Amino acid sequence: MMAAISAAEHGADVVLFEKNDRFGKKLRITGKGRCNLTNDCDQKEFLGNVPTNPRFLYAALSGFSTEDTKSFFENLGVPLKTERGKRVFPVSDKAQDIVHAMERHCRDCGVQMIREKVKSVVIRDGIAVGIQTESQALEADAVIVCTGGLSYPTTGSDGDGYRFARAAGHRVTELQPSLIPLVAEGKLCASMQGLSLKNVSLRMVDCETGKCVYEDFGEMLFTHYGLSGPMVLSASAHLKDITPGKYQAQIDLKPALDEKKLDARLLSDFAKYQNKDFANSLGDLLPQKMIEPFIRLCEIDPRKKVNSITREERERIVRQMKRLCVEIRGVRPISEAIITRGGVDVKEISPKTMESKLVSGLYFAGEVLDLDAYTGGFNLQIAFSTAYAAGEAAACQTPRTENQ
C-alpha cells in the first residue's frame, strides 16, 4: 500500500493487486497486533540494527526517514507513541488502525484496489510491460513487487515475489528464517512451558569458538519446544547455520547481583527458612514454576533441610542462577519467522529507485529484497522506505499509463 500511495501521490494511475481476502493482512498481526511501525532513532543507529546490506538503505532512508513515517501516519489521523527501545506504536495499540488509515489514503489518492492473485509479470525485450492475473492481463509502464518473504504464509507471503524475480533473471540469495523462536535440546524448557522471565540477561555463545555472539537484557519465554520472547527473537538474527550443539543460550536469572552478593542473599533466605526443605526455600528468588526443574539442575535433594546445605551446594545454586544453560538444537519452521533472511540480490537493484538493473520498469520493495533487521520497528521502516522510493520512481516511468 505504501508503494501504491507513493506512486499515486507522484501523479501515477495506480492499480494495487492483493491476493488475500483483505488488504494489509500481515500488517494487522505485526507487533502482536499492536504494529511497531518504526523506531525513533537516527539513521546511524538505525543502520546499526540492519545486519544485512545496510549500505543499500542509505538513499531510501534519506528519502523516507523514520520521522517521515511518523509524520505520514499522524497526518492520516493516527496518533503515535514511543515506548522502551524507541519503538513507535499507534496510541490505540491496534495495528488495524494503521491498515485502515492506509486503505483510506489509497482510495483518497485514486488507487484502484483489486483483490486478485497475480500469476506473473509480463516482460518483453527486457522491459516490464504488465502483469497477468488469474482472469486478466493488464498493461503497465511499471510493476512494483511488494509480496513479502516466506514468513507467515497464511497472510499471503508464500514466495511469489521470489518466483517473479527469478523469472526476470534475478538471483535470490539463500532464504532462511530470522527473528524466530529457538528449539532446545532436552526437556528443561518444556518443564517450564509458559513461564515468562523479565529483567534477565541472555547470552548466546558459539560453542565451537567460545565467542559470545549476542547479549542483551530484557524478557524471554519458555515454550514446549524451547525459547521465545523479544530477546530470543533478536538473538536468532545473530545465529548463522544453526545445527545441534553449535549454540548455547546462557541465562542470568539475577543480573543485578554478582556471585558474592547472590550467595549472601541465599544465606539470608536460608536463615529465614532454616527449618524448611530446600524445595520450599527458593520462592523469594525464583518463579514457582521454575523451582522444581532448577533443583534438578543443581542435583540437590529437594527434601534436604536448608540448614544442611553445604557451601559447595550453595556455590552450585549460585552458578545455576547466574548461568542457566540451554543447548540449542535449531529453529522453528520459517512459516513462524517474523521475517525472512535472504531475498532478491540487492546488487541487481538500484538503491535510489528500487528498480531492477536487469529489467526496465520492474521494481522490488520490502521483505522480498535481501534486507533484514532486528526487532524494534526496523523491518517495517525498511518496507516503508523502499516502497516509497519504488513508488516515486515508478511514477516517473514514461509514457505513463497504469502502474501496479
Where are these regions (language model features)?
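Short hydrophobic core segments
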Residues: 15-17, 118, 131, 138-157, ...
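A conserved FAD-binding loop/helix module that cradles the flavin
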Residues: 149-168, 370-399
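Glycine-rich FAD pyrophosphate-binding loop
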Residues: 8-32
